[in-house]
């Protein structure tokens, strides 16, 4: 599926330049799990309106573990059905388009 919407306005970051836990999460997503949290893989509704406006169910969210702390923390990947990976480290307040290859 082709990516939905215009992503040209997003800051880009290479996967290798993110915390190592981001690579761990990316590899789990590419394998289809298993995921450490039941919320992983659920639909991300884009209520904040920051990501391109796509059909309901287009985006899914995944936890990027935070080394300290027992909760899920604030880091996530939001992945589009077209293969876009958006990284947030502030719980959806901002996103960077992640270059995964």
Swiss-Prot record:
Keyword Cytoplasm: no
Coiled coil start-end: none
Catalysis: reaction(s): [RNA] containing guanosine + H2O = an [RNA fragment]-3'-guanosine-3'-phosphate + a 5'-hydroxy-ribonucleotide-3'-[RNA fragment]
Stored InterPro entries: N1-like (IPR000026), Ribonuclease/ribotoxin (IPR016191)
CDD domains assigned to the protein according to its UniProt record, in alphabetical order: RNase_Sa (cd00607)
Protein name as catalogued: Guanyl-specific ribonuclease St
Disulfide pairings: 4-54
Key word Lyase present: yes
Family (UniProt): Belongs to the ribonuclease N1/T1 family.
Source species of the chain: Saccharopolyspora erythraea
Class of the enzyme per the UniProt entry, highest EC level: lyase
Active site: 61, 91
GO molecular function list: lyase activity; ribonuclease T1 activity; RNA binding; RNA endonuclease activity
Record EC number: 4.6.1.24
């Amino acid at each position: 599926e082709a990516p939905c919407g215009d992503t040209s306005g997003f800051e880009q970051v290479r996967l290798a330049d993110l915390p190592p836990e981001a690579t761990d999460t990316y590899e789990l997503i590419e394998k289809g799990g298993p995921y450490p949290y039941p919320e992983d893989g659920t639909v991300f509704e884009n209520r904040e309106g920051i990501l391109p406006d796509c059909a309901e169910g287009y985006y899914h969210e995944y936890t990027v573990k935070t080394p300290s702390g027992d909760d899920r923390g604030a880091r996530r990947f939001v992945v589009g059905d077209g293969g876009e990976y958006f990284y947030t480290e502030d719980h959806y307040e901002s996103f960077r388009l992640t270059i995964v290859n």
